Amino acid sequence: MRYFIFYIVIIVSSSLNAHQPKIINYSPNIDEPHEVVYPEISKAYYGQLKGEPHYYVIRNEEDFLFYTSILSPKVNENYTWLSLEVLDENQNLIYKADGSKFNWTAWYEPYARDWYWKGPEIGIKTEKEFQSSFPINGGTYFIKVYNDNNTG
């Protein structure tokens, strides 16, 4: 069974420690998205697509720093690509990270001692291993995780 790991990093304060893991064992949809509670705390969502895309919602009145990415456990040399979209409150596309056109790379996570496929990110490119957060206006945002057949 393959699970994707979806990171949301939203920073509204200057202190950021380790992320909070959250297991998503249902399929949050656009009408009932998974609420990102306390968005100022970095989160890692663990989920599995079972025929429908997953939706997450961030409601934040204040401007904040935003970053999101996707990882998938590396169980063999093949990966299932996944994409990310950020939509505004009217479900208009704001940002897209197309996993089908992304060069997925193997990445070792030293704390968990696990290998992952590192997928696309929505952030500011850096010279580092991962992109960084960028300023975004306060408001309501939906994050969609999907692929062609919504499995993985």
Cite the ranges covered by each PLM segment.
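Hydrophobic helical h-region of N-terminal Sec-dependent signal peptides
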Residues: F6-I10
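Noncatalytic accessory or regulatory domains flanking protease catalytic cores in secreted, cell-surface
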Residues: W81-G152
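Juxtadomain low-complexity/linker regions and immediately adjacent membrane-anchoring helices
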Residues: H19-I30, Y79, W104-T105, D148-N150
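Non-catalytic extracellular/lumenal accessory regions of secreted precursors
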Residues: N17-Y55
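Positively charged n-region of N-terminal signal peptides that target proteins for export
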Residues: M1-I5
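N-terminal signal peptide c-region/cleavage motif recognized by signal peptidases
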Residues: S13-S15
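Mature extracellular "passenger" or substrate-interacting domains of secreted, surface-exposed proteins
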Residues: E35-I41, E52-H54, E61-S69, T105-T126
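Hydrophobic beta-strand segments within beta-rich accessory/binding domains
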Residues: Y55-V75, Y141-D148
